[in-house]
Amino acid sequence: MNRVQFNHHHHHHPD
């Protein structure tokens, strides 16, 4: 799994 792929699939945003 590439870093770009991971970032694209998982978006981490603060609550």
Curated annotation (Swiss-Prot):
Pfam families in alphabetical order: His_leader
Keyword Amino-acid biosynthesis recorded: yes
InterPro entries noted in UniProt: His_leader (IPR012565)
Keyword terms, alphabetized: Amino-acid biosynthesis, Histidine biosynthesis, Leader peptide
GO BP: L-histidine biosynthetic process
Family the entry assigns: Belongs to the HisL family.
Function: This protein is involved in the attenuation mechanism for the control of the expression of the his operon structural genes.
The name this protein goes by in its record: his operon leader peptide
Source taxonomy: Bacteria, Pseudomonadati, Pseudomonadota, Gammaproteobacteria, Enterobacterales
Gene from which this protein is expressed: hisL
